[in-house]
């Protein structure tokens, strides 16, 4: 089951490095402003966007597999129909590297089947919640 209780959400906020799949270069978009907020809170934000070279002062990777650094949490800003592909990449990374043990799907983003498959492989999942809102609520 995806994490919904405050204790589990707060535990995921102990992450240090967050890969943001679908990170945007455009201020004013949630996919830019949420990662910028997280960066201001002290998280290392690693943007994943094949159409950008740099976002928020960090080199942007084309795919999650291309992120060289260890990843604690994957924050997803992609449409729900793309979630299976994104979570497959999280599962592969977790199996190959032992990191990326959790994925946080932003507000409005869900895919129960893909989430269940990822959980079966040991990935913790949050769906349909804003990481910025939950961080502010639990740690602000």
Predicted feature locations:
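NAD(P)-binding Rossmann-fold cofactor-contacting core
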Residues: 24-28, 36-56
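Structural detector of well-ordered beta-strand residues that form the stable sheet scaffold
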Residues: 46, 102-104, 126
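Conserved SAM-binding strand-loop segment of SAM-dependent methyltransferases
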Residues: 58-63
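Short N-terminal or domain-adjacent regulatory/targeting segments
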Residues: 1-15
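Mid-chain, well-packed structural core segment of small domains
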Residues: 64-109
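Conserved beta-strand elements of the Class I
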Residues: 19-21
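Rossmann-fold NAD(P)-binding glycine/threonine-rich loop
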Residues: 107-135, 139
